[in-house]
Structure formats: structure tokens, C-alpha cells
């Protein structure tokens, strides 16, 4: 830092030469800004070398994949599976590692529901979705940010540490590396991974008509099970009404069998004359005999 300051001061305020000029005292005005400060000896000419911290490098240009992902339209689809679950899909061209954010937007600046998912891939099932009380309309915003980096550091690498002053004093030749050494990967939140977010605004009421929501769709399995259970209930109901009839009829007297039993008994035994009928016939015979006797006495 000191040689650089001396060079700037010398350029701003040039000093007059003393006893032969600056050629006799090469170290008076300092070294150029693009020269190395680690010379091996005073007689050796100073060779210009590249310093990692002398000038910042050119800004990094995004790769073609990242540029395509940034310019690509949102390819996000949301389907409602159950009452409180969503199935989210997005295109793979957006990246490998994706972060997903879901939050409500109709609460006047306060998110009634918010969820975050880190390093996920499609498809993603979001369960236990927070629903507004009273069946009110709920607007949500879904943001997906994806990056093309998988566990490597994308930020600018730091230069290596400067050599010690003892090595420079001893005159040992030291050379700075042409490229700075890579540092070991740090935590994920220090890696500086670029993400390209794409957001989608939707409402839960708009998803009710989609074929992915099973509450509005009746699968063939449910229909068949419902028909079978209805048939079973009808059969059991009819059987419950019919099965007591033959059992109760077995305990009741049968009219046809009673008539057959009476006819056979009458044919086997002689007919009996009733007592009243016999007395009337005897009275009639006695009256006839008395009348005959009376008529015979009158003729004599």
C-alpha cells in the first residue's frame, strides 16, 4: 500500500532531481504500480508481475444456461389434490436446485399462510395448506427460484496471502501464482449461488375446476363401490321383509289340509241322524196312525 501511495504523490507533485536525478536513486520515488515488491536483490531488474489485488477483474458474464433460464417464461403449473394440498410442477430448464416460496397475498401486507422449501425438484406436493376462515377467497403467490450450480462456489475467488517480510529480506525468490488458489467450499449461505425467481399468482377457487382435484371428480372405483353397496342394502332390505313370511305361515293352520281331513273322516264313518230329526219323524208317524184309526171308526 505504501509504494502505491508514494507513486501517486510523485505523479501529482514531481520533485526536482537531486545530485544526478532520479536515475541515481531508483528507490526515491518508489516502484511502479504494476511492478512486484518482492525483488530478490538491488542489482536485479524489477520484472513486472501480475498482482491479484492490483486491479479488479472484468465482471463475470452469466453462462448460456443461466441466461436462457432468466429469459425463459414461467412454466409453473399448480393442481389441487385435496382440500388442503397442492401439487406443483415446473420445467427442468429453470435449473437443478430450486427454492420454492408460497405465501398469501390478500391479507393487506400480512401473509396469512407462508411456506418455504429449499433445494427441491419437481413435482412437489405441498400438504397442510392454510385455509382462510369462513371460506373466504384466498389468493396465493408461488415463486420458484432455480440455479445451475451444484455444490460449487460461483463467487470471485480471493487472492492468496502475501509472502512474509522475512522471506523478502532473506532474498529468497518468491513468485505469485498466475491464478489465485481456490478456497474450500464454505456453508451454503456463503456460496453466493444465483437464483432466477419466477412467480405465479393464483386463487384457490380457480383450481376447483381442474381435473386434478379429486373432490370434484368421482373416480370409477368410487362409483362401483357405491353401486355395489346400494345393491347390497336393497337385497338385505327385501330379505328382511320376506324371510319371516314362511316361518309365520308354518305355524298357521292350512285351509286346504283341513278340508281334506274332514272329507276323509266323513267317508270312513256312517252318517249319523241328528236327534232332533228322529223325534220329529216319530211324531209325524204317530199323528198319521191316529188319523187312520179315527177315519176307520167313523166309517163303521
From Swiss-Prot:
Residues annotated as glycosylated: 75
Induction trigger: Up-regulated during Ras-induced senescence.
Predominant subcellular localization, coarse grouping: membrane
Domain of life: Eukaryota
Subcellular location: Membrane
Alphabetical keyword list: Glycoprotein, Membrane, Signal, Transmembrane, Transmembrane helix
Positions of transmembrane segments: 231-251, 273-293
Annotated family: Belongs to the TMEM158 family.
Cellular compartments per GO CC: membrane
Signal sequence coordinates: 1-20
Maturation and modification: N-glycosylated.
Any GO molecular function: peptide binding
UniProt lineage: Eukaryota, Metazoa, Chordata, Craniata, Vertebrata
Membrane topology summary: Multi-pass membrane protein
Name of this chain's protein: Transmembrane protein 158
The protein's role, per its UniProt record: Receptor for brain injury-derived neurotrophic peptide (BINP), a synthetic 13-mer peptide.
Amino acid at each position: 500500500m505504501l509504494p502505491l501511495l508514494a507513486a501517486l504523490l510523485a505523479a501529482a507533485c514531481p520533485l526536482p532531481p537531486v545530485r544526478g536525478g532520479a536515475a541515481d536513486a531508483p528507490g526515491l520515488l518508489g516502484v511502479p504500480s504494476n511492478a512486484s515488491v518482492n525483488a530478490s536483490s538491488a542489482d536485479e531488474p524489477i520484472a513486472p508481475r501480475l498482482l491479484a489485488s492490483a486491479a479488479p477483474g472484468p465482471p463475470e458474464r452469466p453462462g448460456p444456461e443461466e441466461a436462457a433460464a432468466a429469459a425463459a417464461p414461467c412454466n409453473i403449473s399448480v393442481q389441487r389434490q385435496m382440500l388442503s394440498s397442492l401439487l406443483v410442477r415446473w420445467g427442468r430448464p429453470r435449473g437443478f436446485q430450486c427454492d420454492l416460496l408460497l405465501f398469501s397475498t390478500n391479507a393487506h401486507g400480512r401473509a396469512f399462510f407462508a411456506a418455504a422449501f429449499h433445494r427441491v425438484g419437481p413435482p412437489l406436493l405441498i400438504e397442510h395448506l392454510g385455509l382462510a376462515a369462513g371460506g373466504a377467497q384466498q389468493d396465493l403467490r408461488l415463486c420458484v427460484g432455480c440455479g445451475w450450480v451444484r455444490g460449487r462456489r460461483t463467487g470471485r475467488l480471493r487472492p492468496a496471502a502475501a509472502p512474509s517480510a522475512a522471506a523478502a529480506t532473506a532474498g529468497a525468490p518468491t513468485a505469485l501464482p498466475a491464478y489465485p488458489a481456490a478456497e474450500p467450499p464454505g456453508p451454503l449461505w456463503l456460496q453466493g449461488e444465483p437464483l432466477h425467481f419466477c412467480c405465479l399468482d393464483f386463487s384457490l377457487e380457480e383450481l376447483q375446476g381442474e381435473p386434478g382435484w379429486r373432490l370434484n371428480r368421482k373416480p370409477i372405483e368410487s362409483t362401483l363401490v357405491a353401486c355395489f353397496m346400494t345393491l347390497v342394502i336393497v337385497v338385505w332390505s327385501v330379505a328382511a321383509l320376506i324371510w319371516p313370511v314362511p316361518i309365520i305361515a308354518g305355524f298357521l293352520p292350512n285351509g286346504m289340509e283341513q278340508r281334506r281331513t274332514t272329507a276323509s273322516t266323513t267317508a270312513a264313518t256312517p252318517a249319523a241322524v241328528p236327534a232332533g230329526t228322529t223325534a220329529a219323524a216319530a211324531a209325524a208317524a204317530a199323528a198319521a196312525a191316529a188319523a187312520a184309526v179315527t177315519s176307520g171308526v167313523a166309517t163303521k
